[in-house]
Amino acid sequence: MEVRTCLVAAGLVLAAGTASAGPIPMDTPIKLGNVETVCTGIGEGKNDPRWRTYPVRVELVDASARYIAGAHVSLSDVTGASMAEFDCSGSWVLFRLPAGLYTVSARLTASPVTPATARFQPPQTGQTRIVLRFPAQP
């Protein structure tokens, strides 16, 4: 009986934590807690008309504004509480999330350059474009 109680308690602690995933599949919407996200931006997948319905599009670019693929992405709310963390193999990350003020941060998986961060609010209509620009690699 004690083992079952401990397992239930451990499950509740995990459920209360950050919604996280390892690498998420390309061009496939997934739900992480209150956040729906899509990793895309490569090849024909980026032209899917569904992606225009997402209110937030985060683009990963280098110092010359060329798309970069592959980053560990973190999303937090206005209090700094982590809402989602995952690895994206694409150069775009789309979000559908409740109204509010958020911070998105990305760290390139194949480079030691400084992470890029931006604060944003989802628009009431349309799509906002957030560009995370990474400095030139050393």
Task: Report the location of each language-model feature.
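A short, structured loop/turn motif at beta-sheet edges
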Residues: D77-A81, L97-G100, P122-T125
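Short, acidic Ser/Thr/Gly-rich low-complexity loop/linker segments typical of extracellular
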Residues: T79-G90
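A short tyrosine-centered beta-strand micro-motif
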Residues: G100-A106
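Primarily secretory-pathway and cell-envelope proteins
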Residues: A21-A71, L75, L108-P138
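Short, surface-exposed beta-strand/beta-hairpin micro-motifs centered on an aromatic residue
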Residues: G90-R96
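Bacterial N-terminal signal peptides that target proteins for export
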Residues: M1-V8
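N-terminal signal peptide c-region/cleavage motif recognized by signal peptidases
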Residues: A15-S20
